[in-house]
Amino acid sequence: MFDSLVDFLKTNIDELNGHELQISNEFKEHHNKDSKYIIKNWLFSSPEYRKWRITRLDGGKNIQVFNTVAYPNFDSELPILGADILWFGTAKKLLAILDYQPLIQENKYLEKYCSSLGMIKKKYSAFDNNKMKNIYDSKKYFSPWVIICRGNKLNLDRDLNDVFHAFINNYLNLNKSNPVNQFLNLEEIKINQIKYDKYSFEKDPADKLFKSFFGEKWTKKFINKFLFTLNNEIIL
């Protein structure tokens, strides 16, 4: 499950003249003790994106997880793309959170870079769940148009691929339009990406999930060395 999303991203990254980066074997594929849970990771870079990572967790019928985060280069003030998609097989429940995660919360910045998400939410009403907005901090790295779905198998089978494709294509089109930085300079962009990683290192809900499957030692290393690598950077 979710392999089609991985393939879709790989195709798009390839079209951006992106290339896969080498990562350590312990992150490339990792099994828990009885191999009931298997996690696979990919890391890419392209001329426009300094880091684009993909994570797939296969927990059989219990749980399936897909995550991707794209960091633009430090010379671009574009938001960070973030997507978390979870399928709980036993309960037949889908949870999806997709957003263009803003570097700042200034209204004009949000309107310029994030408001187009509203068109996707309008087209797919199941992915416009305002009741779940308490699961994230709207004053930090989330936009007012964050896409949230707490759905079922129908949403998984019928809607998810279309929503994800629209989400990715729209984001890539933002970059292709070559927007001029209006709000942040290079140093401010780098600082805000560092702050994003530090915030995510502390707040990412996947921490508990990974610890329960793979243990605390591996999870801490994984989050620090693969997911949020700018967490250890010092802001002067």
UniProtKB/Swiss-Prot annotation:
One family name in Pfam for this protein: Fe_bilin_red
Alphabetical UniProt keywords: Oxidoreductase
InterPro entries per the UniProt record, alphabetical: DiHydbiliverdin_OxRdtase (IPR023658), Ferredoxin-dep_bilin_Rdtase (IPR009249)
Entry keyword Oxidoreductase: yes
Function: Catalyzes the two-electron reduction of biliverdin IX-alpha at the C15 methine bridge.
Family: Belongs to the HY2 family.
HAMAP family for this protein: PebA (MF_00792)
Protein name: 15,16-dihydrobiliverdin:ferredoxin oxidoreductase
Organism of this sequence: Prochlorococcus marinus (strain MIT 9312)
Encoding gene (name): pebA
